[in-house]
Amino acid sequence: MPLKDALLSDVCISTSAAPTYLPAHFFQTKDEATGKTRDFNLIDGGVSANNPTLLTINQITRKMIVDKQDLFTGGPTDYDKFLVISLGTGSAKNAAMYTAKDAAGWGILSWLHSKEGYTPIVDMFSYSSAALVDYNVSILFQALHSEKNYLRIQDDSLKGTAATVDVATKENMEELVRIGEGMLAKTVSRVDMETGKPVPVPEEGTNADALTRFAKKLSDERKARMTSSQGKPSSAL
């Protein structure tokens, strides 16, 4: 569909245009064959899906149902055949930035921008949106005994400049790379169904170990598909 064939640069700028931080983005696509154009006026995709994991799973499931493709031996809702890696962009959730006593005296401006430089209402909506999806997806996979097929890597302990979304200095970029690389050495964690908080799962090793296992599964699946005489996949998507 030519009118949906947007430049990747426009897509990236649009989905990063967080309200109050960065400006909304406009671009236009054109169907050269018909001359028709389509205008896009967009802001950060996180406004509707700050954690797009569940949306992605739904889209894949929908595609399998619509296309009637037999990519699952047990049907499109057989989650044992899904491998999901969810990479968070970090948050400052663990930092005690606000208290009910403080918020009780806030007016409109304080909710939008605190004296410490944070945006309380935006931070709260963003975190709750992402955390709820992580909780729901994690519980879904656990309930279906496929918890090892879902890997969430997220740092909720960001502080200072690293916790901002609009500081693109060389120093901050290098710090974020350091934090990201450090996450590989951390123990795999999974949401506790009672508390809703992530807890370490030592027996599954580090995030790097889990990624290696995922990579092997995908590699084995690709080899199986390529050698299948019928051209049908055997397991994971």
Predicted regions and their residues:
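Conserved catalytic cores and adjacent C-terminal regulatory segments
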Residues: 1-237
